[in-house]
Amino acid sequence: MRPFSGSDCLKPVTEGINRAFGAKEPWQVATITATTVLGGVWLWTVICQDENLYIRGKRQFFKFAKKIPAVRRQVETELAKAKNDFETEIKKSNAHLTYSETLPEKGLSKEEILRLVDEHLKTGHYNWRDGRVSGAVYGYKPDLVELVTEVYGKASYTNPLHADLFPGVCKMEAEVVRMACNLFHGNSASCGTMTTGGTESIVMAMKAYRDFAREYKGITRPNIVVPKTVHAAFDKGGQYFNIHVRSVDVDPETYEVDIKKFKRAINRNTILLVGSAPNFPYGTIDDIEAIAALGVKYDIPVHVDACLGSFVVALVRNAGYKLRPFDFEVKGVTSISADTHKYGFAPKGSSVILYSDKKYKDHQFTVTTDWPGGVYGSPTVNGSRAGGIIAACWATMMSFGYDGYLEATKRIVDTARYIERGVRDIDGIFIFGKPATSVIALGSNVFDIFRLSDSLCKLGWNLNALQFPSGIHLCVTDMHTQPGVADKFIADVRSCTAEIMKDPGQPVVGKMALYGMAQSIPDRSVIGEVTRLFLHSMYYTPSQK
C-alpha cells in the first residue's frame, strides 16, 4: 500500500483549479491570478492599517463633503472670519506698538532697545505677577531673575556642541541631569540629557524607543500605547517619527487610564507604554505601577511623563503628602521627562529626559559618520544648543537647593489642597478625579462650565479650557501662594457660580462659546484648520498678505 503524503490532501484542490481554468486562455489565467493577488494585498492593506475603518471612513466622508461647492463656500467663509478675528485680536493687543519690518539703517542704542523691550513686555491682558493665571509663570523672584540674568550673560556665547571649547558648560549639563536623576530615584546607571522643553524631551524618548525597537526587535511599524489624557507632544512625536499613537480611555470617575483597556491595546508592534505623573487636563496620576508591570510582562519600555509635575511631583511625598510610587523606584520604568522650567523654576527653554540605562539614551543620539564635514553627532534635536540656558538652569538648581525645592513644593501643594477643599463644596460644580499635585479641574452637570470661565475671565482670571468633556482647570504655581490669592480665587468661583445658578440653562456667549462649539463639530479637520490660522496670526505683521 502506498504511504500517505501531503500531496494527497492537495490533490482535490489542484484538480478543482485545473477544471476551473481548463477552458481559459493563458492570458486570462494570468490576469485572474494577478487580479486576485493584488486585490488580496489591497484588502489586507485596507484592513490592517493602524487606524480603524470607522475613523478612516469618517475622515474620507468629510473630505468628500467639503468638495461640495455649497459646503466648501461655507467652510471658506467661516475660516476667513476666523482669520480676520485672530488678526484683529493681535492688532488690538499691539495697537500701541510700532512694527519693525526692516532692519534699522543704523543700530539702536542700548537705552532705546531696552525702552522698546519694556514696551513689548507690558502688553498682555492678564496680571500674572498677582497670581491670576493658570500655570504659564511658575515662580518669579527678582533676586533669582537677577542671578540667572547675570549667569546667562556670562554664558550666552557658549555652545556645548563645541565640548573642547566649553567643557564647563558640558559639566553643568551633566550635573543638572545627575541631580534630576537622583530626585527621581535613579541609580548609578540612570542617565539623560537636557532639552529645550517638555515636548523635545518627549519626542526624543519616542525617537530613542523607535530606533531601539527597530534594532533589537525588528519592529518597522511601531506604535505606542498612551492614556487619552497624555500630553499632545506624543501626537507630535508620532507625526514626526511615523509612530502610531494608540490612545486609551480613562476611567470616568478617577480620570486615570483604564488598565484593562490599556492592556488590550498592546500588540506585537508596541514599542512603548506611557503614563502621566500627572496629566495636564485633570492633574491625576495614572497607575504607573500597573503600567510598569505590563511593561515587564511584555518586555516593553515604560515612559513616565512628569513634565508638568516636575520637581513638585518628585518631592511631594517628602513634603508630607501620600502618592503612589511612579518614578525609577518602580520596576519597569525606563524613562522620565521632567521640565526644569516649570517647578524647577529655571528660565524657559530647559527640560530633562532621563533614562534608567544608557542603552536607551544611546538610541536618542543622532550620529552621521560619512559627512564630508567630518563625523557628526548630537544628543538632541538641535545641533548647536544654548549654553546660557544650561548654565542658567544649573544656577537656579544650585540656588534653590534641596531644601528650597522642598519648601516650594509644600507651599504649592498646600495651596492647591486648600483651593480644592474650598471649591469642592460649591453647589453646581465638581472636581474631576482626585488632584495629585497642583492641578484642579472643574466641571458642571448643571450649567455650561465655560460660563464660569467667562465670568472669572471678566474678573481677571485666566484658566485653561478643557474638552471631551468640557472643563476648566487651575494649575497652581508659586504665584498663587502669595497672601490672599487662593482666598480670592475661591471667593470668585463661589460668587460667579451662585450667579450662574440663578439661571443655569443659559448658553455661554462670547469668546468662550467657541470652545463649546469646537467640541460639537464632528469634522475635526476644520478645527485643525482654524488652529493653523491662529498659529499664522501669531506671526502677523502689517505688510504680510
UniProtKB/Swiss-Prot annotation:
E.C. code: 4.1.2.27
Residue intervals annotated with topology Lumenal: 1-26
Highest taxon in the source lineage: Eukaryota
Molecular-function GO terms, alphabetical: pyridoxal phosphate binding; sphinganine-1-phosphate aldolase activity
Record note on what altering R210Q does: Decreased function in sphingolipid catabolic process
Signal peptide: none
One of the GO biological process terms: sphingolipid catabolic process
Root EC class: lyase
Free-text tissue specificity from the UniProt record: Localized to the developing gut primordium during embryogenesis.
Pathway: Lipid metabolism; sphingolipid metabolism
GO CC entries: endoplasmic reticulum; endoplasmic reticulum membrane; membrane
Cofactor(s) listed in the protein's UniProt record: pyridoxal 5'-phosphate
InterPro entries, per database record: GrpII_AminoAcid_Decarb, PyrdxlP-dep_de-COase, PyrdxlP-dep_Trfase, PyrdxlP-dep_Trfase_major, PyrdxlP-dep_Trfase_small
Main location class: endoplasmic reticulum
Compartments reported by the entry: Endoplasmic reticulum membrane
Gene null: resulting phenotype: Flies lacking Sply display decreased viability associated with altered nephrocytes morphology. Altered lipid metabolism with accumulation of sphingosine-1-phosphate upstream intermediates is observed.
Topology in the lipid bilayer: Single-pass type III membrane protein
Modified residue annotations for N6-(pyridoxal phosphate)lysine: K342
Pfam families: Pyridoxal_deC (PF00282)
Cytoplasmic side, ranges: 48-545
Keywords: Developmental protein, Endoplasmic reticulum, Lipid metabolism, Lyase, Membrane, Pyridoxal phosphate, Signal-anchor, Sphingolipid metabolism, Transmembrane, Transmembrane helix
Reaction catalysis annotation: sphinganine 1-phosphate = hexadecanal + phosphoethanolamine
Function in brief: Cleaves phosphorylated sphingoid bases (PSBs), such as sphingosine-1-phosphate, into fatty aldehydes and phosphoethanolamine. Sphingolipid catabolism is required for normal development including viability, reproduction and muscle development.
PANTHER family reported for this sequence: PTHR42735, SPHINGOSINE-1-PHOSPHATE LYASE 1
Assigned protein family: Belongs to the group II decarboxylase family. Sphingosine-1-phosphate lyase subfamily.
UniProt-recorded name of the protein: Sphingosine-1-phosphate lyase
Source organism per UniProt: Drosophila melanogaster
